[in-house]
Structure formats: C-alpha cells, structure tokens
Amino acid sequence: MQRGPFALAVVACVLSSTLASSAQALPSIHIVTLPVDSGAEAFYAADQGFFKNAGLDASIDVMPNGGATIAAVSSGAADIGFSNVFSLAQAFNHGVPITLIAGAGLATQTSPTALVVVDASSPVRTAKDLSGKTFAVDALKSITELAPRAWIDKNGGDSSAVKFLEMPFGEMAVALAQHRVDAALLPEPFLTRAQATVRSIGDAYPAVAKQFLIGAFFTTTTWAKAHPDLLKRFVAAIHETAPWANRNRAQTAAILAKNSKIDAATLGAMRRVMYAETLAPDVVQPVIDIAAKYHVIDSDFAAKSMIYAE
C-alpha cells in the first residue's frame, strides 16, 4: 500500500520521537573527581564508552581536592565522588555517612609513585639522618605525613624528632634547593619534573603496607540505598575500566593529559599508578591502621564497615 506524504510525515515524526526518547532513556549520574592519575578512571570510562556500555549518562566535574569531593557528595550536590582513602576514612570515623563503592589507584612496591627525596647535594642519606631536620608534606595529619613517619620509624630513625611542615607539592623542589626544608615526600608528576635536582632516599609507602588503596570512589549510604541499580551500573563501568587502563598506558596518558594540567611529555615519563580491579578490605585496612597508630583518628575500625554491601 502506498503511503501519502502526510502518513509518511507522521511515521517520520513517530520514529524521531521514539529515537529521541530512546536517546534520553539512559539514567544520569553526576560524578566529581580530581585531575590526578589515581582518580582518572572516570575520565577513561567516559572517553572509552564504558559508562554508556553500563547504561549510564555520566557527567563529570573536576574538584580542587578530596575534601571538596567529599563535601559535594555528602551534601547531595553530586552522586558519586573520588577521594583519597585516608580522607574518606577520617570522614567516616567522624560520622559522615559515606561508603566506598569501587577502588581506584593502588600504592604498590613495584610501581612507586611517591618517594622521599632530598636536594641532590644534601648530605642526608638515610632515615636516621633526618633527626632534627625539616620534612615537607602537602598536608599534615594525612597519608603524606604518616607514611614518612612510619618509614622513618621502621628504618632506624625517630619521627618524633623530625619537624613536618605543610607545603604545596609544586613548591617542594625549590624549597629543597634553597635549603628551606631538608626532605619531602614528592609524588608524581612533581617527582618527574624535579628529577634533575632531587635525589630519592626511600619509598615511604611500603612502611604502611606492601599494597594499599590510595583512592576510591564513594557515595552516601542514602544514595546507595535509593539507587541500587545506578550503583551497580557505575561499579560495572569502573570494573571494566580498571583492567583496560592497566593495559593501555599510552591511551590513558593521552586522556589524562586532556583532563588535567599534566603535560603529555611528563605523563609519558612519570611513574603511573596501577588501578584496583576489585575493592577488598585488605587494601583499605592499612590506611585506617596507620591513622589510628599515629592518633589521627581516635580509634581503629574494620575497613569492611566502610565498604558498600548490598
């Protein structure tokens, strides 16, 4: 049967409407993350279509620090966020109703991404040499202070005899060269940028554990209970992303360069994190334990209690 122009127009309109509705059918989630290697999986998942594969329309906003992402998620301004596990453990310990839903960057002995450094001309060679010295960290009472403390104490030094100073990572190499500080914990990409002027004297993170989670994706317990399907889809997307990212370093470097202030040359040269392909309590517990040991949180607790369980 031949259709007239009007009938064809109606069919076209219906098809157009159906396609538009189909295109709008993906549920949306709002993610907040940081422009850093350890938290870059959201960028990779968006770029490679892993969120769409999981049936999600994901919008991503970049925040200045982990505290800002925790504030955004806990206030309801965002659905899911990325932050460092140390800050998340502190927030959880203080009663903020958050839950970890997927792992991100791992600290491992095989791929160290932050080292204890001194100026290249410094006489400091060992942890013992740091007694009476000044040590720069980006934040006091954080993993970047406690890991060096543990490293000093485990290697014949006394961390109580070391003065820790707060300083932005970007200023540390200059401060070392000017002898304003004696040592620093310098992570990537700052480590690669400063390699001509600094010398490593140790890897502090293994003093916490052979392997532990640097960062994780999280949400509130309220959002998790209200949106179990969206949560499953997000976790599925990240679980697809992690092994892909671990295998495709050149592609991840290019994606991260587009979403951060780290230039492609530095990304190509620097040490990169490995991404956790599962979320297990045993890679979270060391962070909680070190915080309790150095009295940054008032009591130790089981990592399992802050990991989402259906």
Model segments located where?
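Conserved C-terminal helix/tail region of periplasmic/extracytoplasmic solute-binding proteins
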Residues: 291-310
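Bacterial N-terminal signal peptides that target proteins for export
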Residues: 1-9
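Sec/Tat signal peptide C-region and signal peptidase I cleavage site
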Residues: 19-25
